[in-house]
Swiss-Prot record:
ATP binds at residues 53-60. Residues 425-436 have a biased composition (Basic residues). HAMAP family: DEAD_helicase_RhlB (MF_00661). Its EC number is 3.6.4.13. It is found in: Cytoplasm. Keywords: ATP-binding, Cytoplasm, Helicase, Hydrolase, Nucleotide-binding, RNA-binding. Belongs to the DEAD box helicase family. RhlB subfamily. Residues 40-219 form the Helicase ATP-binding domain. This is ATP-dependent RNA helicase RhlB. The lineage of its organism: Bacteria, Pseudomonadati, Pseudomonadota, Gammaproteobacteria, Alteromonadales. A motif (Q motif) lies at residues 9-37.
């Protein structure tokens, strides 16, 4: 993390349990981020918070530290049964729940507290067997949690700490009735520690907080800055015919370490993926109908660097928490202004620099004024030289083919860039495509 992202507040200065301090030290966490520095003093006094912070600001560690410390500081209810977790952390997507669980296990190893994770789409019986052994901290998506509650597999009447992460996305995905269902079955709000985090503290999010929390204090990090200063934004105005050549040319010119390409529809994502695969890129495709096991496999490949570019719709990408994404490409400008913020927030995380490139084509250019009004600044326009776009682009692959694994897809940075795919002719590097 860069110094600009961190505060001067050290974790060591907080009165945390020694087991929590030990885990933080072993994980390399010394200084707090702003959201951690502001929220932890409140939470350690056992007061509720409703926190607003951009994605990638460290809010996950903030509520995990508070949750672990609270459970270690609070007596276990005498009547607690094996199927009653002491804390529950609700997330809008499987991927976010999985990431939270990974971070939680880092903090758990010296505490003796058991972490369990549940989510829909797979592993119902496997997850149930874990719950049958008892967990202290339950992390998961609301639908699967409710399934287990209704079947009596778990009981939430001994909950001592609650976290609702990405509450605004919970509303977007229609999960609020599920959340209220669970809250009504928990102890009174005054007898538990309640934490809510959201990218935006809209009126509906604040209403949820005040309905189910105990006079939460509002914590805001740069609420007027919708996008991170660590992200360099630019926008191009390509014709429909030049969108794909421009994308492929910029990918070669930028040579991103790890990139996400967003498009507005499943069909468009499949088209983009087909061209990327045909041009020799190691690309993964995430749309709403990708099976869960394949989805997790693609995300694991992307995280490990076996895939360099992820092509995704907004629905499929919600809740993704992947580090070191260097570039985000908006092949289509989103129809929803908040989706623009969430998209580019995949890069420039944890103090790192990021790049956001958007295309304002004939079909979606009308979305730009609303987006710029929402983010409260104009996106710098970049022109390009049409004659400098790649003209040796191989044809796209068929969508039913599995991503190829032969040497054409091996991006060996030591020996230069791919040489024109199937044509094997050197691409032009004598002309820059960007003109300020």
């Amino acid at each position: 993390m860069s110094e600009t992202h961190l505060s001067t507040q050290k974790f060591a200065d907080f009165p945390l349990h020694k087991e929590v301090h030990q885990a933080l030290n072993e994980a390399g966490f010394e200084f707090c981020t702003p959201i951690q520095a502001l929220s932890l003093p409140i939470l350690l006094e056992k007061k509720d918070i409703a926190g607003q912070a951009q994605t990638g600001t460290g809010k996950t560690l903030a509520f995990l530290v508070a949750t672990f410390n609270h459970l270690l500081s609070t007596p276990i209810p005498a009547e607690r049964q094996l199927n009653q977790p002491r804390a529950i952390i609700m997330a809008p997507t499987r991927e976010l729940a999985i990431q939270i669980a990974k971070d939680a296990n880092l903090l758990a190893k010296h505490t003796g507290l058991k972490v369990g994770i549940v989510y829909g789409g797979e592993g119902y019986e496997v997850q149930r067997k874990v719950l049958d052994k008892g967990v202290d901290i339950l992390i998961g998506t609301t639908g699967r949690i409710i399934d287990y509650v209704r079947q009596g597999v778990i009981n939430v009447s001994c909950i001592q700490a609650v976290v609702l992460d990405e509450a605004d996305r919970m509303f977007d995905l229609g999960f609020i009735k599920d959340i209220r269902f669970l809250f009504r079955r928990m102890p009174d709000a005054k007898s538990r520690l309640n934490m809510l985090f959201s990218a935006t503290l809209s009126m509906k999010v604040q209403e949820l907080a005040y309905d189910h929390m105990n006079e939460p204090e509002k914590v805001e990090i740069a609420p007027n800055e919708k996008t991170s200063k660590n992200i360099k934004e630019e926008i191009f105005y390509p014709s429909m015919e030049e969108k794909m050549p421009l994308l492929l040319s910029l990918l070669e010119e930028d040579w991103p370490e790890k990139a996400i390409v967003f498009s507005n529809t499943k069909h468009s994502c499949e088209k983009v993926w087909s061209w990327l695969e045909g041009d020799g890129h190691r690309a993964g495709l995430l749309t709403g109908d990708v099976p869960q096991k394949k989805r997790l496999r693609i995300l694991e490949q992307f995280t490990k660097g076996d895939i360099d570019i992820l092509v995704a719709t907004d629905v499929a990408a919600r809740g993704l928490h992947i580090s070191d994404v260097s570039h985000v490409y908006n092949y289509d400008l989103p129809d929803d202004c908040e989706d623009y913020v969430h998209r580019i927030g995949r890069t420039g995380r944890a103090g790192q620099k990021g790049v956001s490139v958007s295309f304002a084509c004939e079909e979606y250019a009308l979305n730009l004024p609303a987006i710029e009004s929402y983010i409260q600044h104009s996106i710098p326009v970049t022109s390009y030289d049409s004659d400098a776009l790649l003209d040796d682009i191989p044809p796209p692959v068929r969508i039913h083919r599995k991503p190829s694994t032969h040497t054409r897809n091996t991006r060996d940075r030591s020996s230069g860039r791919p040489q024109g795919g199937q044509r094997n002719g050197p691409r032009r590097h004598d002309k820059t495509r960007r003109h300020s």
